[in-house]
């Protein structure tokens, strides 16, 4: 008979312990799983709490900043206004004293600037020199304003063209305005009776300046003078035209009268040669006298009657008419 090596009762206990061990392991595993979930939930809740804490900190910081700004504003409001006034007065003291505001309001005309220009007179302009060339020659000595050159008369121009001359414009004399009179005086003093110069083979190299400074004369004076001369010329022309018309009319009337008198005298002479003392000559002479002398007008006047004159009776007029018929 085989002997037992182990106790059955002990084996049963060990098996129970083993089963219990397995059960404990499973229970431990089951306990481990929810703990992990709890840890995740705990981590999530902690993150949310941290975010909320950060938001609360930010809100608290904003509130503190707003309070600080309000405190700063209150502090600036507390600064007395006298300091600002003192600062403004200090700035005003630094400004120049002669500074003025330029206001152009309606009803207040602005005073015009003083005219400091000067005018020179050129008694002779080189032949066929244009105003642009003259300006280019005088500009180096100062700022040039207006230029006026007198053209040659139309009659002399037509005569020159008929003689085979060039069609370019020819100017006789002129006036030049400088914006500053000191430049005009300098030009008149230093360039008068001097050669124009420039390139040696230039067209105007040997021409001579003839310049005179017009003291106390401005450009508007020249314009007024030219306008007055044009008005006087037009008035003289109108007077001459009216005088010529009246002279022509009187001449034609005298010419017609002379022809008529010559015709009458010729007819009278013919009749005298024929020995006919016709009455037609007297009639012709009367006609001539009527044409030469103005007719005399005579007016017939009615007789004066008194208010007390008696009116004729009704039957007297009829009797007078019947007596004249019988």
From Swiss-Prot:
Feature: compositional bias, Basic and acidic residues: 21-30, 266-290
Composition bias (Acidic residues) maps to: 11-20, 45-77
One of its GO biological process terms is:
endonucleolytic cleavage in 5'-ETS of tricistronic rRNA transcript (SSU-rRNA, 5.8S rRNA, LSU-rRNA)
| Disordered: region residues | 1-77, 266-326
Where, subcellularly, is it found? Nucleus, Nucleolus
The entry's function note states: Involved in the small subunit (SSU) processome assembly and function, and in the 18S rRNA synthesis. Required for the early cleavages at sites A0, A1 and A2.
What family name appears in the similarity comment?
Answer: Belongs to the ESF2/ABP1 family.
Name of the featured protein: Pre-rRNA-processing protein ESF2
State the organism named in the record.
Answer: Phaeosphaeria nodorum (strain SN15 / ATCC MYA-4574 / FGSC 10173)
